[in-house]
Amino acid sequence: MLIDVLELVTNKKDLEYDQVKNLLDNILEGELDEIKFGAFLAALKTKGETEKEISAFVDAFYDKAKKLNFDHPATIDTCGTGGDGKGTFNISTAAAIVLSCFDVKVAKHGNRSITSNSGSADILEKLGIDIQAEEDKILKGLEKLNFAFLFAPLYHPAMKKVANLRRSLGIRTVFNILGPLLNPVPLKYQVVGTFSFDAQDKVASVLRGNRKKAAVIHSLDGLDEISISQKTRVLEIQDKNIKEYYIDPKDYGIKFDTNSIRGFSPEENARILISVLEGEKSPYFWAVVLNCGFALYICEVAKDVEEGIKLSSKAIESKKAYLKLKELRQFYKSGV
């Protein structure tokens, strides 16, 4: 089966959903021919993955995932693809903590760093939060504190099968955009940052029709966040429609150089996050309130981004966000 599909893809033929899904199901149930599957991934990348092909990857790995039974009308994730190569501070993780101060349930899906200094798992671990909490703890945390971290390797054991191959290939493949599409919690809302405009288009096409409201973002200066330096392209998804527009930070009185929000070690990033939640008005602060403000708009807490920024700022300035972090550290103690 794999050789037949490989022949089609190397000739730049698009595949049907069932062709890819059946292939992946067989691979995940049986033996993996790394050479042929690696060639398939590389050929698929060269051809350009279609919505049907990506959806088949998502469904095949989601079928094998450990899922969490948590149904709520306002579940949201702010997990990005990572891999933008900019080495910025953990903006979406900090924004997720502020977001949990509101009446939404933040299911933060993430992993350790692969390309940056500090992934979401790394910084949360340094904050003393157990990134491998048991399921009952996760569900209780979502219910009581509006926040849980879902450490991707715990929920996607099937990914281990392709881990060595991905490392050996050393190039971006369809797997680099799957993470945000595989949250173990059923999401109503989502903000996904991507590493390129091409990835942005692909993720948006797959999300369409699968969330109540979502947005996929990539900035002109290459960030997988809403930028505080340049305009950010937004693909907003609602009712199966995709609307494109740009967010300019200057419209909200925010303008800083991208280098002003660079990230460091997990320890240093944890210190920066605490300083943000304590209300220190640094570029990091404005990056967090801008991104949280946008998320509040997407999950329909704020009527627009401007109101979202005001709400985010108030949550920090009132110490509500800092107290939330203290609650999370106490609840998800890791002993670090």
From Swiss-Prot:
Keywords: Amino-acid biosynthesis, Aromatic amino acid biosynthesis, Glycosyltransferase, Magnesium, Metal-binding, Transferase, Tryptophan biosynthesis
GO cellular component, one term: cytosol
Binding site for anthranilate 2: 166
Annotated residues for binding of 5-phospho-alpha-D-ribose 1-diphosphate: 80, 83-84, 88, 90-93, 108-116, 120
Residues binding Mg(2+) 2: 224-225
Pathway info: Amino-acid biosynthesis; L-tryptophan biosynthesis; L-tryptophan from chorismate: step 2/5
Biological process, per Gene Ontology: L-tryptophan biosynthetic process
Alphabetized GO MF terms: anthranilate phosphoribosyltransferase activity; magnesium ion binding
Catalytic reactions of this protein: N-(5-phospho-beta-D-ribosyl)anthranilate + diphosphate = 5-phospho-alpha-D-ribose 1-diphosphate + anthranilate
CC cofactor note: Binds 2 magnesium ions per monomer.
Record text on subunit structure and interactions: Homodimer.
The name this protein goes by in its record: Anthranilate phosphoribosyltransferase
Organism of provenance: Caldicellulosiruptor bescii (strain ATCC BAA-1888 / DSM 6725 / KCTC 15123 / Z-1320) (Anaerocellum thermophilum)
